[in-house]
A protein has these predicted regions:
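Short glycine-enriched nucleophile-adjacent loop
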Residues: 60-69
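Alpha/beta hydrolase fold serine-hydrolase catalytic domain that processes acyl esters and thioesters
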Residues: 1, 5-47, 68-296
């Protein structure tokens, strides 16, 4: 059997949960993945391959680590494609260590997502088209007949990003990380934006609203201090060339916006599916359910 977990959708809520992984021992999607995988493997006896892309890769590994020994023995392999990592404590748990040797990890040469938090399995580096977050799209991964075209290592920029984020996370407690990311997403949510697509479609208005919320928030000093620390660490990781961390972040945001626009069909954007159904004579009340659960 093959169980595959999907990644994050375009909602701000979904991305907020991704960053919550930096300070929460378990996020709701991980718990749902654990429950789903346990249920499926209990119902259908046999050997399993578990896989996932992006956040789905994180869920695949996490869910497998939470299985009891009998079910873990039925997992033949786990394939993780450009997924964010874990807190260091998780990587030392008995459940994770039991399935560590079964993990096959892959990341693009200019990786961003898989450079967040920590891993113990060395990922194979895949040659890709595009740069930055556009390489997160699997359609941009290069294939040679039946296998990925590989590179020796990720780009220097990707290495620097990983070193910066890793050192910054190590320097802060769970409470400090929760406060920082809570402030960031609190500001974004205060602008009324609910999806990354809305940011891309109304970027100028979003920036104006964001500046206003940052100016008015009680967490302004907290955010300034956090970004100043990131900037200082980033400079320590290399020379002064392209040493502005905020400019790098802006580039990642621009790339992420393009990434989301390529990832999500118009029919799945808020309001678009109903318009299309009405045009085609369909039922505008019909809704589809999307979850982080896998499929078998």
């Amino acid at each position: 059997y093959l169980v595959v977990f999907r990644g994050t959708d375009e909602t701000i809520v979904g991305w907020k949960e991704d960053f919550n992984m930096s300070h929460q021992t378990q996020v709701p999607a991980q718990d749902a993945a654990r429950e789903y995988l346990t249920k499926v493997m209990t119902e259908f006896d046999g050997q399993y391959i578990i896989a996932g892309h992006s956040k789905g890769a994180n869920l695949a590994i996490y869910a497998a680590s939470q299985l009891d020994k009998k079910l873990q023995d039925q997992v033949s392999a786990i394939y993780a494609y450009d997924g964010p990592g874990y807190q260091r404590d998780f990587l030392e748990t008995e459940g994770y260590l039991a399935i560590e040797s079964k993990i096959h990890a892959f990341q693009p040469e200019d990786a961003v997502v898989s450079q967040i938090l920590f891993h113990t399995v060395q990922a194979k580096v895949v040659a890709c088209k595009g740069i930055s977050m556009m390489q997160h799209l699997l359609e941009n991964w290069e294939i040679d007949k039946v296998s990925f075209k590989e590179r020796d290592s990720v780009t220097p920029g990707s290495q620097r990003l990983q070193a910066t984020l890793g050192q910054w996370v190590d320097q802060h407690s769970a409470q400090e990380l929760e406060a920082f990311f809570g402030a960031i997403f609190g500001i974004i949510e205060a602008t009324g934006i609910e999806t990354l697509n809305e940011i891309g479609d109304n970027f100028l208005m979003f920036l104006i609203s964001l500046q206003r919320e940052i100016r008015d928030t009680e967490d302004s000093d907290l955010l300034k201090e956090g970004f100043a620390q990131l900037q200082a660490i980033y400079k320590e990781q290399g020379d002064e060339t392209n040493a502005n961390f905020l400019e790098v972040v802006q580039g990642k945001i621009d790339s992420a916006t393009s990434f989301i626009k390529n990832l999500v069909p118009d029919a799945l954007l808020p309001g678009k599916s109903e318009d299309k159904q009405v045009e085609e004579g369909g039922d505008p009340q019909a809704k589809s359910e999307e979850t982080d659960h896998g499929t078998i």
